[in-house]
């Protein structure tokens, strides 16, 4: 029965690819078929193998490794992304795309093959070397427009314009400022070849490839079945299944929109059938899928950049991310449960759920994740080598079941998919490097720091609030990776200088860069969910924002209670913060939902909301008042409902 349901859902939403193309720019790829497809996939697979080589074995000059990596990205990028997503012909690539591909890739390969001579001459450049740098940057920006969108180009363009003004006018260099910018942004490791693309080449790329292998191993289907077994029969089961499965699948896919479409094609129809409103069903899936990027052990690409910015082992980043991620999904789970009780919804009949025993027999599919966590946590190997070993383990465990077996043909597909998935992330890293370079070399980062201090009057909460607004606005058009790089360069240092621990400050900007995917007006994950649910897009986005209210609260808890991210704490303190935060989340969820055991009047909603928020503020007094308010409203509702039933 369960397999039939999955098949029916897949048939009903066989236009999932169309939805991905509409809401996810990374999915707007060229259409290759037959022999051309085989050739392009072979190029993508070859690039994936080279990316793995760079991460696992390469011992070469950084400039050589990075320029060869970016050169390959430009080649496979232009083979993958068309100039206009609305005019894509099968097996067609216009001549000008070939020109851009060859010139852009050639510019970086020129640097690669002449790296030693160029580095020795820097900052002096010959005119033709300046021209090569300009060509390479133009090709990179055009690929950025195709793969990640216009907004990040605009942001980078504004910062580059300021950098030109800074050197050309303020420093009096005139047109010589062009050479200065090309030198610093193209040839020196303070721009394109900076921290973001270095992290991408070292370990982000191989983790993306590992994710492609995991997806092809059948682990997503296992996660959905596992979620059904855990929560399917409970009140409002399908929505809880969506939360659990999206959290698990999201940490593999790394894409809010992609996860919404793939798991939502199964879970959203189930939620609607149970009785949830379409806009709520789409919102649940979008909110849960967006949280996949903060779910350890495989988080979004920005989490890997955090390793570079903080100089902290990835295992520590993962460990510190566990409690905030748990609170995020607890908040969504509570909201879903209260909505189910409000609508008197039942769960999925046990006869329609997957049998437990066959499902448990597939638990071996988790082995690659377990091995990865073990390798990373014990620091036995580098992150890249840990991911490489996990890929080998994935191939090995896939042999246990015929339908999941990674044959040579499927391994080829995994490599091609992994290579394709690297393009948009790598391009975003390159452009983020340009932005970060402009910020640091002009001193603009310090000016932004001074401006935030002035506007906030050195008040921590106001500084946090303005940082949150900047992250969300930037995240509406800029990929999470680039958003994090910009905010980590500009706003995170401000928060750190105001006394917030570095890891808490970086998690703060990381979280708010992600929630832009469900925050109106540009809430792409929510809009993808609404398309599947056939609901009003704006209502779906507003519901998703309400469901993910934890994402707007947890970062503040981290800033005010660093124990949430395991900074200068002990076990007792952590337990206390977790308990008070969960109870506080319950209070806020009940206030937003307006229902506990019966409808909650407005005054009591305000009281329980205030109590919930107070419990998230560190301090014995605030916890005491919060418990009194939340507990009082809870007791009043409980005994009131009992009296009503007795009557």
Residue ranges and their predicted role:
Residues 29, 54-59, 81-91, 117-118, ...:
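Membrane-water interface regions at transmembrane-helix termini and the short interhelical loops
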Residues 95-98, 104-108, 113-117, 124-125, ...:
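Hydrophobic or amphipathic alpha-helical targeting/insertion segments
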Residues 142, 146-147, 155-171, 178-179, ...:
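Core transmembrane alpha-helical segments of multi-pass membrane transporters/permeases
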Residues 224-292, 298, 302-305, 311, ...:
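Hydrophobic transmembrane alpha-helices that form the pore/transport pathway of multi-pass ion
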